[in-house]
């Protein structure tokens, strides 16, 4: 992990616009967040903790530090799991701060043509499309069966550890959406709508189906929402804030069109945090 003050090339933008300075002032630097942060636990580096990142953001906003490539790398290194928020006595909205800064950094980044094309395909064509996701995951499944994922670093420019960390694609029988309705078992306790998500049906479909069975066993009729794919959480985490908002609005409209009075249940924490 590079030091966040290394690399002297600043981003071509007004440094003070990169950070939500008002929110950064809420941090009292108590350090309770350190034990909850996976990147701090991995590296032991203060810079890779929520407190350290807030210190960096504040320094950039106050023009005490340059918004270098190292600063951007540290912002990208955060998982935005928001576990730190659960223990913060000051109520710092760390997730909102990270999304704001990542969005501003993305606006000012100068990516190469291959990187721009890959992001356009992934965020504009694959994630918002059930067919696009199915084709992409099917291609990944074939590559894993043929042991071609080791070629990904050379072909797609991906880092080796990224391809090594990709989960095995489950069998096709598990990669299916929920039925339109799963009836309640026993005495009915009401109806719920399930947000299936985009990646969940393709890589963790059995979790969605287990969720539906559990809710049905508890007495709830489970309804899925037609034509819903992506809520925009992955876009927000990666600085694509405008499209994230568009997808969130579309998701809300589709759920309201089915039943705007039903509780919404989901099993993906990232989707839940984004939609809230």
Q: Residue ranges of each PLM-predicted region?
A:
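Ferredoxin-type iron-sulfur electron-transfer modules and their immediate structural context
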Residues: 1-75
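Iron-sulfur-cluster electron-transfer modules
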Residues: 15, 21-24, 54-228, 234-275
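Conserved beta-strand edge residues that scaffold enzyme active sites
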Residues: 41, 229-230
């Amino acid at each position: 992990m590079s030091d966040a003050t290394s690399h002297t090339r600043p981003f071509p933008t007004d440094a003070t616009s990169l950070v939500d300075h008002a929110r950064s002032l809420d941090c009292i630097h108590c350090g309770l967040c350190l034990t909850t942060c996976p990147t701090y636990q991995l590296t032991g580096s203060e810079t890779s903790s929520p407190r350290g990142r807030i210190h960096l953001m504040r320094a950039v906003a106050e023009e005490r530090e340059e918004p270098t490539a190292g600063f951007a790398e540290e912002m990208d290194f955060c998982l935005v799991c928001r576990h730190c928020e659960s223990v913060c006595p000051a109520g710092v909205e760390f997730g909102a701060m990270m999304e704001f800064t990542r969005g501003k950094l993305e606006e000012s980044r100068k990516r190469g043509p291959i990187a721009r094309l890959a992001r356009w395909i992934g965020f504009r064509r694959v994630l918002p499309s059930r067919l696009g996701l199915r084709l992409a995951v099917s291609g990944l499944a074939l590559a894993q069966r043929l042991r071609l994922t080791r070629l990904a670093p050379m072909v797609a420019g991906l880092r080796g550890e990224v391809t090594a960390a990709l989960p095995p694609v489950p069998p096709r029988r598990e990669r299916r959406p929920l039925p339109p309705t799963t009836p309640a078992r026993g005495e009915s306790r009401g109806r719920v709508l399930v947000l299936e998500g985009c990646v969940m049906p393709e890589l963790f479909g059995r979790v969605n189906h287990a969720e539906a069975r559990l809710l049905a066993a508890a007495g709830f009729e489970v309804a899925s929402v037609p034509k819903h794919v992506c809520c925009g959480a992955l876009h927000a985490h990666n600085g694509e804030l405008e499209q994230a908002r568009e997808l969130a609005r579309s998701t809300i409209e589709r759920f309201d069109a089915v039943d705007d009075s039903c509780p919404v249940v989901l099993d993906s924490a990232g989707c839940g945090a984004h939609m809230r």
